[in-house]
Regions:
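Sparse, context-dependent recognition of short Cys/His-centered cofactor- or disulfide-binding micro-motifs
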Residues: 1-3, 15-17, 51, 56-59
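N-terminal acidic leader/helix
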Residues: 2-30
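N-terminal start-of-chain detector that recognizes signal peptides
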Residues: 1-5, 43-46
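Acidic, low-complexity intrinsically disordered segments
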Residues: 29-75
Length: 75
């Protein structure tokens, strides 16, 4: 599971903080452009291989829009 929240959008760039497995002690950060392409990321300590950052990127790419906050669950 992955929780995320929008920190802000500046000049068409959305910045999100994400929390692998809901761990708010060790957030990561991802920035997307207005075409839903990842610009850069800072992985969480719980996400050294950027697995969760990649999940978030693909989620927004498929949805075609940004949300304020939410979670993604998979099985």
């Amino acid at each position: 599971m992955l929780e995320y929240e929008l920190l802000g959008i500046v000049d068409g760039v959305a910045t999100y903080q994400y929390y692998p497995d809901g761990d708010r002690e060790n957030p990561g950060m991802v920035r997307f452009d207005s075409n839903f392409k990842m610009i850069d990321y800072t992985p969480s300590k719980e996400d050294p291989g950027a697995y969760y950052a990649s999940k978030l990127f693909h989620w927004f790419e498929r949805k075609g829009g940004f949300k304020e906050a939410g979670f993604i669950a998979w099985g």
